[in-house]
């Protein structure tokens, strides 16, 4: 598994599993809002009043509306205990 996928997949899966509302900013500046319904290697299915298939190469930023735990269903939690919108200053991994 590629290094980029090792963070991206658990992050998106936790957003999906916990039904966290998100704002997705595209590279052209457009803001989309909804919940992650599903995702794969290339796209994210974003659900609001309608479902939208958003290509990952068009995404700049994914912003959760509330704190959530990325590792709530995995065996080895990170030292930060999950993603809460704060960057972990402990980069000695």
Curated annotation (Swiss-Prot):
Q: Which GO terms describe its biological process?
A: regulation of DNA-templated transcription; regulation of RNA stability; regulation of translation, ncRNA-mediated
Q: Which domain of life is it from?
A: Bacteria
User: GO terms for CC?
Assistant: cytosol
Keywords attached to this entry: RNA-binding, Stress response
Any one Pfam family here would be Hfq
Q: Where is this region: Disordered?
A: 70-93
Q: Which SUPFAM superfamilies match?
A: Sm-like ribonucleoproteins (SSF50182)
Q: Tell me which stretches of the chain form a coiled coil.
A: none
Molecular-function GO terms, alphabetical: RNA binding
The Sm domain extends over: 9-68
**Disulfide bond sites:** none
What this protein is reported to do is described as:
RNA chaperone that binds small regulatory RNA (sRNAs) and mRNAs to facilitate mRNA translational regulation in response to envelope stress, environmental stress and changes in metabolite concentrations. Also binds with high specificity to tRNAs.
Instruction: Give the quaternary structure.
Output: Homohexamer.
The UniProt entry's sequence similarity note says:
Belongs to the Hfq family.
| Protein name as catalogued | RNA-binding protein Hfq
Taxon lineage: Bacteria, Pseudomonadati, Pseudomonadota, Gammaproteobacteria, Alteromonadales
